[in-house]
Amino acid sequence: NFFPESFFHKVYPKEFNYKKIFYGVESSLFKDLKPFNDRIKNKILNSGNIGNDKFLNKIINDIRNPKWNSYRCKILRSKCSKLNFVDYFSTINNDYVNDHYPLLLQKYQTAIAADTYTPVQKYWEIPAAGCLAFMEVTEKNEGLHTGFIDNETSIFINEKNYVQKFQEYLEDANNPKWKEIAQAGNDFALKNFNNDAGVSSLADLMAELI
């Protein structure tokens, strides 16, 4: 499981043993993508499901599922989708689902990975595709446990600073530091989150249990 241990035990019984295993990057899908400098740089990509922030919808969803509804789980991602310099794709009912997701990512220099409660697979798919990743990393979602480093392998954002961080990039998009951070994030993601490494870790776990 690639969730933080504290989150894992919020979902599963306390007596379940926990072992962190990262996976999700199928290396062959992230080869030969468009070079960073040839990508869209005046827009930031935001993708995945978001919540409906209309007042009545939030009330209904909070009654049905007060913690795990799509808005509560994706608060920052939902807010980002409203910005005029952000291109939003639902990745549902289009050409960029599942194995084709890297083909969407390669169009943009930058993309957003945001989740309220825990980092998800998007956090390493985005840098694996060579994008500069704007990652929601907070005390609540324990994003530090992924190993990414702010301003070295990604750019950390939260609900207070996300607009400022986006503008810092957009106002200086030609600065070579963005490409350097994207490349460092790419190297880190491909090395630590590829499926071969995940299978190896799972095999080690199985050996421990036998």
Language-model features, listed with the residues they occupy:
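C-terminal "capping" alpha-helix adjacent to the active site of nucleotide-linked donor transferases
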Residues: N158-K177
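Nucleotide-sugar donor-binding catalytic core of glycosyltransferases
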Residues: N1-E125, L132-T146, D196
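A charged, aromatic-enriched C-terminal amphipathic alpha-helix characteristic of glycosyltransferases
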Residues: P176-A207
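A short acidic/histidine/glycine-rich donor-binding loop in glycosyltransferase catalytic cores
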Residues: D150-I157
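C-terminal helix of von Willebrand factor
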Residues: V11, Q164-E168, S201
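Active-site/pore-lining binding-face segments in mid-to-C-terminal subdomains
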Residues: Y123, C131, W178, A182
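Conserved catalytic or regulatory cores that recognize and/or transform ribose-phosphate-containing ligands
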Residues: L144, D150, Y162
